[in-house]
Amino acid sequence: RDEVVRGRDVVISTHTHDDLGMATANALAGVENGAGQIECTINGIGERAGNCALEEVVMALYVRRDWYKAYTRINTREIYRVSRLVERYTGMPVPPNKAIVGDNAFAHESGIHQDGVIKHRATYEIMDAELIGRRPAVLVLGKHSGRAAFKKALEDLGYKDLSEEEVKKLFARFKEIAEKKGPLSAEELQALVESEREPTSHFFQLEHVQFFSGSGLLPTATVKVKTPDGERLATHTGDGPVDAVYKAIQEAIGLRPELELYRVEAITGSTEALGQVTVRLRLGELQAVGVGVSPDIIEASALAFLDAAGKLASGRATRHPPSIEEVHRGV
């Protein structure tokens, strides 16, 4: 700052990349040396190895505020929820060991660590998980839970702006899933809400999906999809159940986008966990990410495909940057 002409009248900003894993450290060094602004991104996403992660630098400044004497206006209790939203909409998963927002950030497996945390959490936790909005669910929500308890759980997760109609639809979907798999965890409930609140998630509606597959059998799928032009029924074979379902869906909706990404993950660790499928579809210059949530992976796969296809069909897709090969061809 001392080297900049009229340095006291300008805001110095840091813009760091994580090529050597030093993006957050370099940004904090900038603050120590007079920077008043940090350019950062949620989950550290960005070019090459990424940029400085907002959640890391914000919590570092908060936890070590006595040292940095710097403050932000970030509502830290929304960090975890926003991180998961970015993960969902970009299709870029948060690594389990990611600082602040990773699944393991507040997990303790070592016996001596567990003992220490039980006696005094600050022994191994530099911050309270609730500071970033990670709070354990107080209520156990299952098939016998009422609407009032369901709505209270949503409010505890930060969903306080839902309309009565939205709560009604979410509750109906929750009861449907709870009947199949049992109680839902806070993480599963959040995934359910986000998948159902998507504006294009109902552009194409999955009415029915069934498939036949097994050793020596040709994988075959039948789907019924509700489109803006009415219901469509289609049957197709494929290399596996998911491939057969996707080919049947393409025939039903009249779109044949290219599948660029397909990822399956369990929202929690048990065999009864909700499955979350993320897909990225490309249609010409357009691309869209879709997410499906269900205790049935095949159904979740179908929901994810229809979610992304709905964005492509409804004009809510993003423009896909050309590949190196396309640039060379002059596309």
UniProtKB/Swiss-Prot annotation:
Pathway: Amino-acid biosynthesis; L-leucine biosynthesis; L-leucine from 3-methyl-2-oxobutanoate: step 1/4. The keyword Transferase applies. It catalyses: 3-methyl-2-oxobutanoate + acetyl-CoA + H2O = (2S)-2-isopropylmalate + CoA + H(+). It is an enzyme of class 2 (transferase). Mn(2+) binds at H15, H17, N51. Keywords: Amino-acid biosynthesis, Branched-chain amino acid biosynthesis, Cytoplasm, Leucine biosynthesis, Manganese, Metal-binding, Transferase. InterPro entries: 2-IPM_HCS-like, 2-isopropylmalate_synth_dimer, AIPM/Hcit_synth_CS, Aldolase_TIM, LeuA/HCS_post-cat, LeuA_allosteric_dom_sf, PYR_CT. It is found in: Cytoplasm. Residues 205-331 are annotated as: Regulatory domain. It holds the Pfam family HCS_D2. One of its GO terms (molecular function) is 2-isopropylmalate synthase activity. Its cofactor is Mn(2+). One of its GO terms (biological process) is L-leucine biosynthetic process. Its EC number is 2.3.3.13. One of its GO terms (cellular component) is cytoplasm. Its main location: cytoplasm. Residues 1-80 form the Pyruvate carboxyltransferase domain. Homotetramer. Catalyzes the condensation of the acetyl group of acetyl-CoA with 3-methyl-2-oxobutanoate (2-oxoisovalerate) to form 3-carboxy-3-hydroxy-4-methylpentanoate (2-isopropylmalate). Belongs to the alpha-IPM synthase/homocitrate synthase family. LeuA type 1 subfamily. This is 2-isopropylmalate synthase. It comes from Thermus thermophilus. The gene is leuA.
